[in-house]
UniProtKB/Swiss-Prot annotation:
S-methyl-5'-thioadenosine binds at residues 35, 110, 141-142, 167. Pathway: Amine and polyamine biosynthesis; spermidine biosynthesis; spermidine from putrescine: step 1/1. GO terms for molecular function: spermidine synthase activity. InterPro entries: PABS, PABS_CS, SAM-dependent_MTases_sf, Spermi_synthase, Spermidine_synt_N, Spermidine_synt_N_sf. This is Polyamine aminopropyltransferase. Catalyzes the irreversible transfer of a propylamine group from the amino donor S-adenosylmethioninamine (decarboxy-AdoMet) to putrescine (1,4-diaminobutane) to yield spermidine.
């Protein structure tokens, strides 16, 4: 990470590359109990949030991530009513989940309250649903929350975390996935951000292996553009308890959705289920 000549530059060692944003000023900085959160004003990308020097989101392109970690799973599950979000402190995923009228409750559990408070202040458009009667915001350890979640009580678990280091490290292992497996109903789905398929396919393979050890039987990794993240290409991985699940989705419902999205569509969902050949080969699909 470096800041010079009015540019913020994040270096990405796995690919020997970097991504940068021209900035006009620093708006805020908070050192929480867990991490350093910074907010910058950019010249072209709106506001920029960093956590421990890594880009988390910008005003301009966060919709790619928030829509793709939410809507594919919600339209794949037959009747998603109870959703748990682990992480997601910026509240963008919660907003997308609660666009679905059939969702009866959505609990967001993020260990760091300061992420949410900074988002409320600088990204208020992401926090539109924070006071929805169906929303519950908890500031606690997501690993402990899932370990204590009643068996068979959840339809979808969304793991919207930072990279698998620091506070998020415990969200990428067999023990955590076992807790998710236990909490999910038989037709439940786990969906987790799974980094860049261009640079970190080995990490995606490891995640899927650990999910399998925890009992999940079928997996689907969905790539999508994310310009503000290293390589500009990101992914989420869905896991099902069902053997040989094809991850078919409720296409009619997706086409007739009564809410606006900026990236996700039913046609796009159909296409993203077909992995690029190099991804399919690496993941054994």
């Amino acid at each position: 990470m470096s800041t010079n000549d009015n540019w913020y530059i994040e270096h990405f060692q796995p690919t020997g590359s970097a991504i940068g944003f021209r900035i006009s000023g620093k708006l805020d900085e908070v050192q929480s109990l867990f991490q350093k959160i910074e907010i910058y004003q950019t010249t072209d990308w709106g506001k920029l949030m960093l956590i421990d020097g890594a880009v988390m989101l910008t005003s301009r392109d966060n919709f790619f991530y928030h829509e793709m970690i939410s809507h594919p799973a919600l339209f794949t599950h037959p009747t998603p009513k109870r959703v748990v979000i682990i992480g997601g402190g910026d509240c963008g995923t919660l907003r997308e989940v609660l666009k679905h009228p059939g969702v009866e409750s959505a609990t967001q559990c993020d260990i760091d309250e300061q992420v949410t408070r900074m988002s409320e202040k600088y990204f208020p458009e992401l926090c539109d649903s924070n006071h929805d009667a169906r929303a519950e915001l908890l500031f606690d350890d997501g690993v402990a929350y899932m370990a204590n979640c009643p068996a068979g009580s959840v339809d979808i678990v969304i793991v919207d975390s930072t990279d698998p280091v620091g506070p998020a490290e415990g969200l990428f292992n067999k023990a955590f996935y076992e807790s998710c497996f236990k909490a999910l109903k038989d037709d439940g789905l786990l969906v987790q951000q799974s980094e860049s398929p261009l640079a970190l396919l080995d990490l995606i393979k490891e995640m899927r292996t650990e999910m399998g050890k925890a009992g999940f039987q079928s997996f689907k990794t969905l790539p999508f553009p994310q310009p503000c993240y290293p390589t500009g290409w990101w992914s989420v991985t869905m896991a099902s308890k069902q053997a040989k699940a094809d991850f078919a989705f409720r296409q009619g419902a997706a086409q007739a959705k009564g809410f606006e999205t900026l990236y996700y569509t039913a046609h796009l969902h159909t296409g993203v289920l077909v992995a690029p050949p190099f991804v399919a080969k690496a993941l054994g699909e």
